[in-house]
Amino acid sequence: METPQMNAIQEEDNLSPEVAFQTPKLNDSDASSFSLSNMNAVGNVDGIPSQNRTFFASPRPSSLFYSAKEGNNSSSSIIYNPSFTFGENASSNANINEAALMKGKGNEGRRQSLKYIPAPKLVPPPPRTRSPVRGISPDAGSSKRSSMTLDSPFNFTTSTLQPHQQTPPSSAASRTSFRKGHRYKHSSVSMNFFQEPEVKIPLNIAKSLPIPDFNDLLSNLPWPKAYIQLSIAALQIFACLITFQVGHLYSWSNFITLSHFITYDIIGSLVIIFVENLSQFQVWFTGTITFPFGLNRIDVLLSFALAVSLCFVGLDLLFHIIEEFIVLFVESGSSLTNNHDHDEINEQIPHSHIANANDSQNENITLWYSILMINLVLSTLSLYKTFYANKYSNLKTKNPIITITYTAYLFIYPLLLDLLSSISDYLATLVISSLILWHGLTIARWTSTVLLMGFSTTSLSNSALFNNNDSTDTTAHTQQVESKAAKEKPSVRPRSMSSLPIATKNTKIRKTGFLNSAGFTENPTTIKNMIKDQIERLSEFKSRYILNYDDIVISKVNFTLYVVLIKITMKGGSDDDELMLRLAIDKCIQTSIPTCETTIDIDRI
C-alpha cells in the first residue's frame, strides 16, 4: 500500500490578503495534469480517465493566515491532502469523492489510504531572532491603532525621566512627574492653609567700591577752581614760614602767634580741597556693605577734628594769659624783682604769646606792616575762594576769620604801646581766645551729634516744618486778636468801595533778643513733637492707630542725609489701609525734612 506524499505549503508572503484568500482557477493543462494525478492516485473503476473538468486549485494562504491564530508563523505546522479541495463548485468535489469511495469498496487497504491521516506535529524551526517578529499589514495596523484610540480614554504618552536635567520643565504638565507629596496645592481642599511665601527682591547693594588713590585725586582736580585754591594755599605756606622766621629774628611773639593761625588756615583749605575732589567719585555718595553711608561721613569727621583743634588753640592762648597773670602776681609779691628778672621769667614760659614793647618794632615798622598786609590779603582770598566757596561752609570752621581778626589787631598794636602798653596784649589775647573757643565749640557740638548719628537741627532752619509752624502760630494769634476786638467793639461791617472782600492783615509777633523763640524751635524734642502731631492729623491715620513719641527716631548721618524710623501699632485695617498710611506718612516727612530716608514699621494687631 502506497501512502501519498504530503507536500508542505509554500509561503507566499508577497501576496496581499485578498489575493491569498481567493481561489484561483486552473488552466486546461494544469487541470488535466491535476485530474490525471488524482485519478491515478485514487483509481478509476474502468481505468479510463474521466472527462476533463474545470478544477479549482487549493488556496494557499500566506504567512498572515498562519499568524492570525496564536501567533504561529510556521508553514510546517499544517499539512493538507492534495485530494482535499474547496472552492466554488462544492457538488463536483462531492461527486468525485463519492465515486472514489464506491470504487474502493472492494479493496479495504486502498480505502484506508484515502483517509486523512494527520502527520505528526512537527517542532517549529528555531527563530532567527530571540523574539518573534510579527508582520502587520497596514490595514491591520491602522485598525488596531484606531481601536486603541477609541478604547483608551486617556492619552498616556511615553516620557523619559531625566532627574539630572539642568533646565526646569517649560510647562506645568511636564512637572507633574516631579511633584513630591500630595499637598493639594492647586485644589480647593487647601482652603489657603498653604500660602506661598512673599517674594523678596534682593537688595542691590554692592559689597565695596574702588577707593581712589593719590594719583586719581591729582588727575581729577577740577579746573580752574582747585588750582586757584591750591595756589593760595601754597602762597600761605611761604607767608607762614616768613612770618615765623621774622618773629624769631626780631623777638616778635605776635608774629609767632600769627603763624600758628595761618597754619590752621592752610590745613582747613587742604581739607576742603580734598573733600571736594573726593566727592566726584561714586564711592562718596553710594552706600555699600563696607560703608553703608558712603565716604561722605569723612567730611563730618574732618570738620569735627578741625573744630577740636581750634578749641585747643583757644585754650592755649587762654592758658598763656593765666601764666602771665601768675608771673605778675609773683613779681608783685617780691620787692627785689626788677625788669631783668621779669624778662628771665617770661623767657622760661614756653610758647609765650605776650609781646614785649621794644625799639625794634619802631625801627622796622615797614617790615611789620608789609608782612601783615601780605597775610591779610592771603587770608581774605582763602576765606572767600576756599571756605565760602564750599557747599556746606556754614556748617564748618572758618579759621581765616580768626586770622583776619588778629591781623587787624596787629595793625593798631604799635599805636597802643604808649597808651595801653601794660594791658593791651592781655585784652587782645583774651578776646581772641574767647572767639576761638566759642566758634570751635559751636562746630564741635553739632558735628559730634552727627558723628553719633543723633538728631542735629542746625540745617533745618529753612525747612517747611518751621514755616508751617509759623503759619499756625500766626493764624492762632490772628484769631485771638479778632476775638478780643469783637469783645471790645460792636460788630460793625466795614465799608468797602468795591465788591472785593477786605483783606485781613496778618501780623506776626516774634520775640527778639538774645534768648528768642527761634532757639527753642530748633530743639529736637520740639521738632519730633511737631512731626508726631502732623502725622496724627493725617486723614489716613485713624483713631485706633497708636504712635508714641519714643517710636520716632530721627538721625543725621552726614551734612545732607537724614534717616527717619517710625513704628506704628495698627489695630484692624486692611492691606490697602496700611499702604495708604505708609504713603501719607512718607509724603508728610519728605515735606518736613528734605533729603531723608524713611523706614515705617507697622505692627498690625
Swiss-Prot record:
Subcellular location: Endoplasmic reticulum membrane
Primary localisation category: endoplasmic reticulum
GO molecular function: zinc ion transmembrane transporter activity
UniProt GO cellular component terms: endoplasmic reticulum; endoplasmic reticulum membrane
Residues found modified as Phosphoserine: 16, 131, 498
Lumenal compartment residues: 247-254, 309, 385-399, 444-545
Alphabetical UniProt keywords: Endoplasmic reticulum, Membrane, Phosphoprotein, Transmembrane, Transmembrane helix
Positions on the Cytoplasmic side per record topology: 1-225, 276-287, 331-363, 421-422, 567-605
One GO term (biological process): zinc ion transport
Polar residues bias: start-end ranges: 143-176, 473-482
Transmembrane residue ranges: 226-246, 255-275, 288-308, 310-330, 364-384, 400-420, 423-443, 546-566
Region (Disordered): 118-178, 473-497
Bilayer topology: Multi-pass membrane protein
Coiled-coil region list: none
Identification of the protein by name: Protein ZRG17
Gene name in the database record: ZRG17
